[in-house]
Amino acid sequence: MLKFTLHKKDGLARRGTLELNHGKIETPVFMPVGTYGSVKAMNPQNLHDIKAQIILGNTYHLWLRPGLEVIGQFGGLHGFIGWDKPILTDSGGFQVFSLSDMRKLTEEGCTFKSPINGDKLFLSPEISMKIQTVLNSDIAMQLDECTPGEATREQARKSLQMSLRWAERSKKAFEDLKNPNALFGIVQGAMYEDLREESLRGLEQFDFPGLAVGGLSVGEPKPEMYRMLRAVGPILPEHKPHYLMGVGTPEDLVYGVAHGIDMFDCVMPTRNARNGWLFTRFGDLKIKNAKHKLDKRPIDESCTCYACQNFSRAYLHHLHRTGEILGAQLNTIHNLHFYQVIMAEMREAVEQGKFADWQARFHENRARGTD
């Protein structure tokens, strides 16, 4: 089930509501990444506290460990991990295609060696849909070929055409399995504007309830990613949710919303938190730096997260330096809270028709830097 309601537009920025089997989501939305069924350093209560509306699970990793037999015993991923709100799962394709020296790609699918035990495995659109059906994610993704950013035009066209054939197979398998959830298609085309449009037009025939933009944030220069967003954002169908996969920095989220994107996911806030890199309204802060050793201030005095309301930079500096697990947890709570606040502020700005003003203030504040 998926129902998308577009409430308001301000330029290309959109304010909507997405209704799924496990709940309602206000968009634009950021989805914390729970690769193995957990958002690193966070438990479900932490996620509720920061007002996370939906999380992402990784089909490939969950298929390998703990496997479908285990997760199936719990009725799906929600029951297994103790999370009662919506979940989106990727198709597993990105991870498989990352194993370039361990896989063989054909029209049927991809054969690869398990990086865990060396077993020979095969992933096809049909198998990806079966896995995601067992996971019972609210939003599943079609299996696509993840086109590298540096692909030639001919390589990119050949790749997107196979992804379109896989989109058709994914949709048929999804329907044959009587999956009650939603399946998104994925727009590919590398760094070629006309190929992106060709991919989008090809997907129209399958009438997916939502569309994702894939193949960005895969190593291409930032201006190239933004160029593709400027090209693709305005031509995505207005009545469907738009998902930008694997992006990104706070600035990327704002740029994406400004160009019509509704949904984002990225490991950046959690990964950076574990490395002591914290996001704030006034730029980024490296908590491991010696200047924070005696600093009694919170990470961000304007922040209402648990870490900022209760602990000093000095304590967080100490936790990071000593490798304490609590440090990673508090840093992650802060970074994910910051991302959720950005999204909430953008939703409000679009509602009020003041997105451009909010965007200008956001960039001005971020450029100011922390002290």
UniProtKB/Swiss-Prot annotation:
Its EC number is 2.4.2.29. Pathway: tRNA modification; tRNA-queuosine biosynthesis. Binds 1 zinc ion per subunit. It catalyses: 7-aminomethyl-7-carbaguanine + guanosine(34) in tRNA = 7-aminomethyl-7-carbaguanosine(34) in tRNA + guanine. It comes from the Bacteria. Substrate binds at D90, S91, G92, G93, F94, D144, Q188, G215. GO terms for molecular function: metal ion binding; tRNA-guanosine(34) queuine transglycosylase activity. Zn(2+) binds at C303, C305, C308, H334. Keywords: Glycosyltransferase, Metal-binding, Queuosine biosynthesis, Transferase, tRNA processing, Zinc. The active site is at D90, D265. Pfam families: TGT. Residues 246-252, 270-274 are annotated as: RNA binding. GO terms for biological process: queuosine biosynthetic process; tRNA-guanine transglycosylation. InterPro entries: ArchSynthase1/Queuine_TRR, TGT, TGT-like_sf, tRNA_ribo_trans-like. Its cofactor is Zn(2+). Belongs to the queuine tRNA-ribosyltransferase family. Catalyzes the base-exchange of a guanine (G) residue with the queuine precursor 7-aminomethyl-7-deazaguanine (PreQ1) at position 34 (anticodon wobble position) in tRNAs with GU(N) anticodons (tRNA-Asp, -Asn, -His and -Tyr). Catalysis occurs through a double-displacement mechanism. The nucleophile active site attacks the C1' of nucleotide 34 to detach the guanine base from the RNA, forming a covalent enzyme-RNA intermediate. The proton acceptor active site deprotonates the incoming PreQ1, allowing a nucleophilic attack on the C1' of the ribose to form the product. Homodimer. Within each dimer, one monomer is responsible for RNA recognition and catalysis, while the other monomer binds to the replacement base PreQ1. HAMAP family: Q_tRNA_Tgt. This is Queuine tRNA-ribosyltransferase. It comes from Neisseria meningitidis serogroup B (strain ATCC BAA-335 / MC58). The lineage of its organism: Bacteria, Pseudomonadati, Pseudomonadota, Betaproteobacteria, Neisseriales. The gene is tgt.
